[in-house]
Amino acid sequence: MKIADIELGEKPLLLAPMEDVTDPSFRYMCKRFGADVVYTEFISSDGLIRDAAKSLKKLEIDDAERPVGIQLYGHLVEPMVEAARMAEAAGPDIIDINFGCPVKKIAGRGAGSGMMRDVPLMVEMTRRIVEAVGKPVTVKTRLGWDDESKNIEEIALRLQDVGIAALTIHGRTRAQMYRGEADWTLIGQVKNNPRIHIPIIGNGDVDSGPKAAEMFDRYGVDGVMIGRATYGRPWIFREVKHYLATGEVLPQPSVCERVEIAKEHLRKSLEIKGEYVGILEMRRHLSNYFKGLPDFKPTRLKLVTLLDIPELFATLDSIAERWGDFDVSGTVPEPLSHDL
C-alpha cells in the first residue's frame, strides 16, 4: 500500500489519532512496536490560528515517528486552509482531515462528523486544502450521520475526485458514537467499488490479530487503523503483525515486561516534555499498563499522583516485584472511554 509516494508495504497498520492519547511519547512506543503510520492528536484549526499553546504543541513531531500525519479539524474553510499550511510547515508526511469525531462539542459545531451533514462543504474544504499544501492529504470519517443517512459511498468518490491520497473509514455512524459493533460491510463496499483507486483504510473494533486478518481478508481493505485497543497496549501492533505473518497468537507480555515498557514510555515522556509535564501526561497511560492486576488500587493511586521521578520508577519496580508471577493472559486492557 502507498499513500501518495509513501510506501507502507503489505497490510499496514496505522495508529489512530486520539485526543489525549497519541502524544509524542505514545506515538514513539507504538512505532517501536510496529505501527506503520502514526497520527497526532487532533488539532483545532481555530486554536492554531489564534496561536493557542496547546494546539501549537501538538505540531511537534520527531523523525523517529515517520511516517507521521498531523490531523486537523474545524468547520470553516479558510481557517482550515490556513491551519493546513501551518501544519505542513511543521514537517509531517501527511495532512489528515478529521471528518469523524462524534463528540457533541465538535460535531455540534459542524466540525468532525458534523461535516457529514454538509457534503458540499466537506468536499470544498478538502479541495481547498489539497490545493493549498504539497503533502498528501488524507481523510478520516464515518459511515454517515445516522442509520438513515449512511452516505460514505458518495463521500468516498467525491473526496477522491478532489484529490485525497487515502481514506480511513470508521465503521459506525455519528449517532452510534462508539456503541454497538463497528459495521465493516460498507467499508468493504467502498473498497470494492471499481471507481475507487485510492487506498481504503478500515477502523473500528480491531483489537487482535485474528480480527485484523478478517478485515483484510473479508473486506479487502488496504490498511487497518487501530485506536482504542492501543490503550495500555502499544505492543498490539507487534501482536497483529506476528499473527498476519504466522497465524500464531502471541502471549500477552508479562507483568515484568510491562513494567519495562512503562519505564521506557515514561523516560521518553520526560525527555520530550520535561519533568513536570512529562509526569502529568503519563498518568493516563501508566495505570492502564496494569489493568486487571488484583489489589492494584493503592498502587494505581501512586502512579497517578506521584511527582517525584525516582519514587515513580521505584513504584514501577515494585509492581514487578509484587506481581511478577501473575498470569496476565486474561488482562487485556479495556478502552478508557468511548468519547475520543
Regions found by a protein language model. Name each.
Residues 1-340:
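Flavin-dependent oxidoreductase catalytic cores
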